[in-house]
Regions:
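Compositionally biased terminal segments of proteins
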Residues: 1-207
């Protein structure tokens, strides 16, 4: 189980409709629910559901960040907006939270927040491009499920996101961009692992 997920679950109880966890943490939660093992992962990839978001969630989120004492707070420019919070004061909190939002300033920062620019790596760039796609964003909203009090993207919906990221990174590496081969392999392996959770009768129309 991902370190700190219990404090996250308790803190955001009642806000399950306003976010979705994707990526490795979603895989870990789904695989654990299915009684299966998953690779170690330390970060929570959090997508805000803009249509359901209210100001209380933003306040609650920043209270959590402050209580966790994250040493590094970073923010990207442009849309979608991306935040990264890392190095909390204890392992009671997730080692890293990566938050994506399609709307600029969807959550308001307290005046005393110290936040620095965020360098964009290949994984962030790939996911940002996917979330900017209206069809993929609608697809994400359709695939939300609550597992043990935490909202994640269901396996049948997570697989297309992983496959899309794999294709995107593979194409970019072939075009000469610097892309870590480990990231490409990670997404492919996750797809194979997630297929263990799929009911053969399940039908999903991917974008």
């Amino acid at each position: 189980m991902v370190t700190g997920i219990d404090s996250f679950k308790e803190w955001f109880k009642g806000y399950e409709e306003q976010y979705a966890i994707i990526g490795g943490t979603a895989c870990d939660i789904l695989m654990t629910e299915g009684g299966l093992d998953f690779r170690a992962t330390k970060d929570i990839d959090l997508v805000l559901i803009i249509e359901a978001l209210d100001v209380n969630f933003g306040k609650k989120f920043w209270e959590y960040v402050k209580q966790a004492g994250y040493e590094h707070c970073n923010k990207s420019s442009g849309v979608p907006q991306f935040y990264r919070f890392s190095h909390p004061v204890s392992n009671q909190y997730p080692a890293m939270i990566e938050l994506f939002t399609r709307k600029l300033d969807a959550i308001q920062l307290p005046e005393d927040t110290v936040i620095t620019p965020l360098p964009i790596d290949e994984d962030i760039s790939s996911l940002s491009a996917i979330l900017l796609d209206d069809d993929y964003y609608e697809f994400l909203k359709q695939g939300k499920v609550t597992v043990d009090g935490v909202t994640v993207l269901d396996a049948a919906y997570l697989i297309p996101f992983k496959a899309k990221a794999w294709m995107d990174l593979t194409d970019r590496k072939a075009a000469g961009e610097h892309v870590d081969s480990k990231n490409i392999k990670k997404h492919k392996n996750d797809v194979f692992r997630l297929t263990e959770l799929i009911d053969p009768a399940t039908k999903v129309v991917a974008p």
